[in-house]
A protein has these predicted regions:
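Short coil turns that delineate tetratricopeptide repeat
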Residues: 61, 123, 193-195, 235-236
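N-terminal secretory signal peptides that target proteins for export/translocation
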Residues: 1-12
Length: 300
């Protein structure tokens, strides 16, 4: 939950684990299915969650909460299941992995459309701000009204854009939209960096490492600062920042020892110690173990 790092294309993909706030209910059956049979969990999620939101939107296309939920659901499914499976399949079957990534791209693109629609529905100035090339802030709008609702829209739309960009195969029409990811995430951080246990801070690590306006040293320094803040905000109970930094920074810079250390630090976190992070940490644990099992594939 990249943002978003892949084993194939470095452009933004590190939110896979972070974005899986999937079923939002950390009940043991849900955790068991996710842990033991993620493909089955994906089919269930697609059948139930996506269909439910789609039906709600058909009844009322201007239902803002449903629009935001659809952005979240489509992005979660694409990142949490299709991209996650694609990353793993890349080591076994390149053709199948690319097919999964292409499927994910369609969901990301659809999520972006819903996100843009939600922006326009709230206030056309939102969308004008998003697509503009200037660096103007929109903090004043975020600080009023339904802040939590707006934060969710900003966060999930940023994730949708990030996913669409990273799964586009380098399509220029998507690559040029990368600044929108930074705009949305920075808007959240500028108002409340602790929102959702520092989720935007963690996502910004991946974005920063892919920001063409930064030198490698600048990107590394900013990412390190974001990582430390994310750890502080989450009280060190969330595995997400460790995995995001490991994949976005350590792997990119080919720092194998640092990569291993970060993943091992993440795995030392007791999943059961904090119910708030139990679901996302279950996903992160599985990915960390997979990364360590296949470490020679990522370092040369």
């Amino acid at each position: 939950m990249i943002l978003f790092q892949s084993t194939k294309n470095p452009p933004i993909k590190g939110l896979s684990y972070l974005l899986i706030s999937l079923f939002i209910c950390s009940c043991s059956p849900t955790l068991y299915v996710l842990d033991k049979n993620p493909q089955l969990a994906g089919r269930i999620y697609k059948t139930i969650s996506l269909a439910k939101v789609d039906k709600r939107l058909k009844n009322n296309p201007n239902d803002l909460e449903a629009l935001i939920l659809n952005v979240e659901s489509l992005t979660t499914y694409a990142f949490g299941f299709l991209i996650e499976e694609s990353d793993r399949m890349m080591l076994e079957n390149y053709s199948k992995a690319n097919n999964l990534e292409s499927q994910a791209h369609k969901y990301f693109a659809e999520a972006v459309q819903y996100g843009d629609s939600a922006f326009s529905y709230i206030d056309h100035n939102f969308y004008k701000w998003l697509i503009s090339n200037d660096g103007s802030e929109i903090v004043d709008i975020l600080e009023i009204g339904q802040k939590e609702e707006y934060f969710r829209l900003f966060y999930w739309t940023a994730a949708a854009y990030g996913g669409a960009i990273s799964s586009s195969g380098g399509d220029p029409k998507w690559i040029i939209k990368l600044p929108r990811v930074g705009k949305l995430l920075n808007a959240i951080v500028s108002v409340d960096s602790s929102w959702n246990n520092g989720a935007a801070l963690t996502a910004l690590i991946s974005y920063t490492m892919n920001n063409p306006l930064l030198t490698p040293n600048e990107a590394d320094s900013i990412s390190k600062n974001l990582f430390q803040k994310a750890i502080q905000v989450s009280g060190g109970k969330d595995m997400g920042p460790y995995l995001t930094y490991a994949e976005s920074v350590s792997k990119t810079r080919q720092k194998k020892d640092e990569f291993i250390s970060l993943l091992n630090q993440a795995l030392k976190i007791d999943i059961k110690s904090s119910k708030e992070f139990q679901l996302t940490n279950t996903i992160s644990k599985n990915r960390a173990e997979w990364l360590l099992d296949n470490i020679d594939e990522f370092f040369y």
